[in-house]
Amino acid sequence: TGLKPFACKECGKSFSNKAYFESHKLMHAGIKPFECTECGKQFLLKQLLKSHQLIHTEETPFVCPECGQGYKSKQGLQNHLLCHTGETNFTCKECGKKFLLQKHLNRHKLTHSSEKPFICSECGKRFSRKDGLGMHQLIHTGEKPYVCTECGTSFRVRPQLRIHLRTHTRETPFKCEDCGRVFATGTKLQVHKVTHTGEKPFTCEKCGKSFTQKTNLNTHQLTHTGGKNFKCEECGKCFSRKDYLRVHQRFHTGEKPYKCNECEESFCRKDLLQTHELSH
């Protein structure tokens, strides 16, 4: 019939179902009657509690038909499926970066805000988000709780481990619809898709040159400043970026972290490994 006889006096929202109406009133009262026995977190609705409780188990009942990745909620699976289609419907007006979901865009927009209320007690670095602070603090503790069962490599966050595992399985679930090329992560697919569109959303304010990726713009901007602030203590060579210095230092230490899965030969730089792998 479409009748909604139950109207909320607080906000005017109407309901056809009395049970939904009663649950809605609890929201205004701040009452969350359903509590998780594992962590104490409280929820307004019983189904929200049930969905939450999957976090405390290894159960992932919602499986992607494309790549087999499991998720604890139907919404999580639906969000993941967008990675396979390559849809990026939400664009940041500040920098042009695109996102699969509105919530990811909202989270990103905080990086453009000057407001950073979350402060690290160890080093004073500020963050716009609480989870960003939490992840940063692992640097000080050295904690890397997510361990690869194949090779023992540890990671600070679970998504890093999940991506790393694909180096062992050689899984490449993200396919470009334009050329058929496949990628291990959705991010790499999005970066690749720009090669088909020719889009270069990141523009240098100094000279107007445009780039497909923000990292390329950041590197380019150093050519205007001429700054080489990172100095090698071994040989005195200076670099414009800390990661360039870190790679250079491997020549002194002999560290070769990039290993070929085919022949076990190791390299100090990832691009050298990629060039080598073409020989197989």
UniProtKB/Swiss-Prot annotation:
> Any idea what job this protein has?
May be involved in transcriptional regulation.
Name of the featured protein: Gastrula zinc finger protein XlCGF46.1
A GO CC term attached to the entry? nucleus
Mind listing the UniProt keywords for this protein, alphabetically?
Answer: DNA-binding, Metal-binding, Nucleus, Repeat, Transcription, Transcription regulation, Zinc, Zinc-finger
Segments forming C2H2-type zinc fingers: 6-28, 34-56, 62-84, 90-112, 118-140, 146-168, 174-196, 202-224, 230-252, 258-280
Give one GO molecular function term.
DNA-binding transcription factor activity, RNA polymerase II-specific
What organism does this protein naturally occur in? Xenopus laevis
Location comes to:
Nucleus
- Family (UniProt): Belongs to the krueppel C2H2-type zinc-finger protein family.
One Pfam family here: zf-C2H2
